[in-house]
């Protein structure tokens, strides 16, 4: 979480969405790999070598060429999906804690359509506690949640980031101190 626009009355945490370095890496890698598979499949059908670093004209179109063409097409569709996620910046947004208005606002960008803008606003009085959850093991999880009265918990840490425990603990303690709300730790 990036911190920006913080004063003694307003605290805003910016959330990075799909425009992460890892998503750019995977989009480029899958795009290059799927292009290679598609060109290999077409080369095996036309018997014209379209890949300069290997001779794929020796493959039989059925079954090797058509299989490579199928894998390349699936990879290309996945690549388009990743680039659209990056373009739309799905998951980006902010968490704003406004003591002046007495509200907590959680905003995220979603997929295009009627619900592209996802925003929930709660009065600070409805927040019972800041919950810190730390799980170790094969699927570790370090997250901060808002415990809302008569509602579910709302996770406010970005998904896909595994911050060090000390950083998550410090963020949770700072938020609890800022909102003057108890910190509930589940370790």
UniProtKB/Swiss-Prot annotation:
Seems to be required for the assembly of the photosystem I complex. GO terms for cellular component: cyanelle thylakoid membrane; photosystem I. HAMAP family: Ycf4. The keyword Thylakoid applies. Keywords: Cyanelle, Membrane, Photosynthesis, Plastid, Thylakoid, Transmembrane, Transmembrane helix. Belongs to the Ycf4 family. It is a multi-pass membrane protein. The chain crosses the membrane at residues 21-43, 69-91. The keyword Ribonucleoprotein does not apply. It is found in: Plastid, Cyanelle thylakoid membrane. It comes from Cyanophora paradoxa. InterPro entries: PSI_Ycf4_assembly. This is Photosystem I assembly protein Ycf4. Pfam families: Ycf4. GO terms for biological process: photosynthesis. The gene is ycf4. Disulfide bonds: none annotated.
């Amino acid at each position: 979480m990036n911190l920006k626009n913080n004063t003694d009355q307003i605290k805003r945490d910016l959330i990075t969405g799909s425009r992460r370095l890892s998503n750019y890496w995977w989009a480029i890698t899958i795009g290059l790999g799927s292009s290679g598979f598609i060109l290999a499949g077409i080369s095996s059908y036309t018997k014209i070598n379209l890949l300069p670093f290997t001779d794929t004209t020796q493959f039989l179109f059925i079954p090797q060429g058509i299989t490579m063409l199928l894998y390349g097409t699936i990879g290309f569709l996945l690549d388009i999906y990743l680039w659209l996620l990056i373009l739309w910046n799905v998951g980006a947004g902010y968490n704003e804690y406004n003591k002046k208005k007495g509200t907590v606002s959680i905003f995220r960008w979603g997929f295009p359509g009627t619900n592209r803008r996802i925003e929930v606003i709660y009065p600070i009085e409805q927040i019972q506690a800041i919950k810190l959850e730390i799980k170790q093991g094969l699927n570790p999880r370090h997250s901060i949640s808002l415990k809302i009265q008569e509602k579910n918990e709302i996770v406010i840490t970005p998904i896909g980031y595994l911050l060090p425990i000390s950083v998550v603990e410090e963020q949770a303690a700072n938020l609890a101190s800022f909102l003057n709300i108890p910190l509930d730790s589940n370790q």
